[in-house]
Amino acid sequence: MVMVDALNLGRRLRVRSTAYVAGEPVPFFWPMRTFIHHNPLYGLEHMPFEQAVRRGAELFHARMFLPRSDYQRWQREGKVRQDTLAEEIARRAQALPAVPGIDWPRWLQALMQSAHDRDVVVPGVRAPDVHAALHGQPPSAQAVDVAVLLPALEQRLHGLTLPEAVDALWGTRLADELDELVIKSYLDFFDEDQSSWRMPGRERGLFAAWSEIARRNARMFLRGLHVRRTLGRVQDPESAVVHVMEEMGIDPDAWSAYFTRELTRLHGWTGFVRWRSSAKHYYWAQRYPAEVVDLLAVRLVVGLALLQESARHRRTPVRREQLDALLHERGAECLLRNALHSGEVLPDWAQRIDDTLSRGGSKRCEALLQRYWPLWQARQGQDQAAALRELAAAADATAALEVLSPEDIAGLIQGLQEFARQEGMVWTLAMEAQAIDQLLAQVQVPQDLAAGKRPFAQAWFCIDVRAEPIRRHLERVGDYQTFGIAGFFGVPVGFLGYGKGSESHFCPAVVTPKNLVLELPAELDPEEDDLLSTLGHVLHDLKSSVLSPYVTVEAVGMLFGLDLFGKTLAPLGYSRWRNRIDADKPVTRLLVDKLTREQADSIIRTLQRAMIVKALHAELHIERERVDDDMIRELRETALRHREGPTRLQRTFGVSDKQEAEFIDKLREVYRVDADYASYQLVRLGRIGYSLDEQVNYVHTALTMIGLTKTFSRFVLIVGHSGQTENNPYESALDCGACGGASGLVNARVLAQMANKTAVRERLRGMGIDIPDDTWFLPALHNTTTDAIELSDLVLLPPRHLVYLDRLRNGLRAASRLAAAERMPKLLPQARAIEPAQAWRLAHRLAVDWAQVRPEWGLSKNVYGIIGRRSLSERADLQGRPFLMSYDWRCDPKGRLLENLLAAAVVVGQWINLEHFFSTVDNARLGSGSKAYHNVAGRFGVMTGSLSDLRTGLPAQTVMREGQPYHEPMRMIALIEAPLDFAGRALQSVVKVKSLVLGGWIRAIVIDPTQGYKPFVFNNGQWEERPPLVAPAEEEHAA
């Protein structure tokens, strides 16, 4: 067997870079436990939106807009702006070919009101055949010219991979078989301890580990897939890619496009590998590396083996030039094959074509094609003529249609075909126009608080759309002022929870926190030795087991049995019972401050002493009670090279010089009692907590960002959020996206603790922000599934605030019940007239029902992003549709805060918005289908059934109801309250957002307070002026 020449470094890098670029249209896919919303067309955001959706449809074989009937339903409900529909039709009609007697706007209006969802243009139809059918004439009797028909088929086949091309002509399933085979290998390699079997050699990388298994894979060998032959000739994924592409005869200039086609067939797996290879801190990626070129190499090697097997059994092509030769030498046969296997063959001809192909022979195929093709073209013409007659009747243009020449009909078909690619965009623009009108009709001129007026409480919520209803109800049940801010509250937190063995990140997925916060029992005093000992154990490298060794398998089984019956028969009562049983976690506090050098040194000494005691027991079988502190101190000093000579270990226990020396060496090398490792531990300890400067900066930024720099309430609630659901792989999608798909409570606790510090407030006072002594920042958690708000860290609440606690809780509970009463009818249409208390109980039951596939709607129906003061929209009922970002341009003279909001919150909001958009328009390809068929894959994703692509989008239950779209797919409408020039500069400064606005990925509105609160809507590349906002009624303002 001849080994392929090793690739030089330059060629290897070229292959890797080509594979990397080919995968760029596929967006990252994060593991499900930290579900991150993403735009499925993120890799195409450099294109204008309308152009990108066309390209996305090609790449992902997906639909980009909904069927016509869904938009018509919304039109009947008043959700489509009629004049925008007419304007867009008229504008686009101007670009269509002029056809005598055809009034394009009337025809297109009729098309958009058609009762059918099917395409109006029949693929491949010929205008003369349509003309003949319209006039009841037979098609012209011309001989079929294979040379004329072949270019279209050749172009189509060249856009496919070779396995797909073979499938198109022979009706095989090579491409599907390839997907199934590689998915099995991907599952084995990427498994994160879900499977009981471990693929050996994974630390060497995907291609290397897979190669070793594939060489000995009996299933592949019995199938006749000789991957061993190919693998014996290559050394690495790059050489495998080169070898296979050369074996298939693919022109090097076409490699990138071919790679993209391969990688987008399983875009979920590709997106996961793209993210994984870039995640420097992801444990599984560091331990078992894999890159896009590995993924591609595995696909190509297996694909070549499938082609070779098919060639042996069916004499199908393996090389591109063989396919081209087949097309030119046996063109009639190829046309018949494509007709038979495309699903468009005339029903009564399928058997005859199949028989002829089985018998073979160019003359037979040519003769059959001459008989079949005119009949097929006639049927095409008849179908197209029927569709045009129906459309002409709806446009009141039947007479105009009947007098068209074949050339005119060709122009008509061309125009209809071009508009068919634009129709979904026209509907979307008209829906967005209506949504913009509805928004501008509800927002009002914002008003500041009356001088000297102090709200009872102020509450910060995440910008998440699910916070809008509860904020609205909270403001209406009492004297509450609310604000919106990204749910990590601007503080990236690395967190080590009480009893946890690993660090979690509570911040946006693209951020890596520098600081680590520890959660400790509240009774520990920061100055006590117990705290230092606890920290020593926290920083120790050894991992503790998940289950105590004293918990028996039988006990676990019994508990699961109780779960099974309890969650099924009485979910709400059982959940309360389990919570009482599990309530063993003590009251905790967070270590937010930096350690002093003395504390850090003391922690390291504590840890070293513990390691010495452990080593004495493990290496010399000496128990702790037999040694005193002086002996441990002496051993520690010796291991750190602070002293030399024998220790008391020799005199007390009769240890020889050699044994003592070996023991000291083990202390240094195995138990890490040495100076270098102590320095490393100091660095690790340096991550704990935040310096005073950092704390002041985080609190100051948060306060100025939301415009809260004066008139502080007695209570300032910092409300994180999370969802609650049982038996749901998408659980993290209901949590806070700004916290990396986790709960926002930790960040709320951290910022509250910072803001309550006297030293921080003193610094802020010097910066012009005077927080009264009686103001207390109180963390809380908003459960978006139940609408409950639970206060946290109440043990730290000053005694003088306790008298107001009942009033605070009563207000929160009332708002929560009203929010539940608003939300339950949307979730369960049968609960239309429901009392708040009943809705509250129902929401809690759904949250703990493990059979519930939709415990809440999540962020469905999101459409607005409002950046401005809350009083701009607080009188509006926006029905849980806006991301509400508090911002006061008067506190931002340089525009830096607005730029930060645009670069972070608006971009993330656009990701969320477009994930809902595309998951709705094609839930099978860009969403994830029904949850009912989902299975967890490797603990990092979900698949449909036992074998499929990784499902990357949102499940049907999140965006659909009873088979119809619940979410209304529109691009995010971002409204900014700021002077037009000021907002324009910020938009220009944030390059990404500038590109998104100019490219039509975001719809932008600016409300200019310096021009009488006039709205300016960005449309078709320019700002369009709208009438000024109205001021609130005097009685409302007084209230």
Curated annotation (Swiss-Prot):
GO cellular component terms listed in the entry, alphabetical order: plasma membrane
Membrane disposition: Peripheral membrane protein
InterPro entries to which the protein is assigned, alphabetical: DabA (IPR018752)
Keywords: Cell inner membrane, Cell membrane, Membrane, Metal-binding, Plasmid, Transport, Zinc
Principal subcellular localisation of the protein: membrane
Annotated positions binding Zn(2+): 462, 464, 721, 736
Gene Ontology molecular functions: zinc ion binding
Cofactor(s) it depends on: Zn(2+)
Described function: Part of an energy-coupled inorganic carbon pump.
Subunit structure: Forms a complex with DabB.
Family of the protein in this entry: Belongs to the inorganic carbon transporter (TC 9.A.2) DabA family.
Protein name, UniProt field: Probable inorganic carbon transporter subunit DabA 1
Organism taxonomic ancestry: Bacteria, Pseudomonadati, Pseudomonadota, Alphaproteobacteria, Hyphomicrobiales
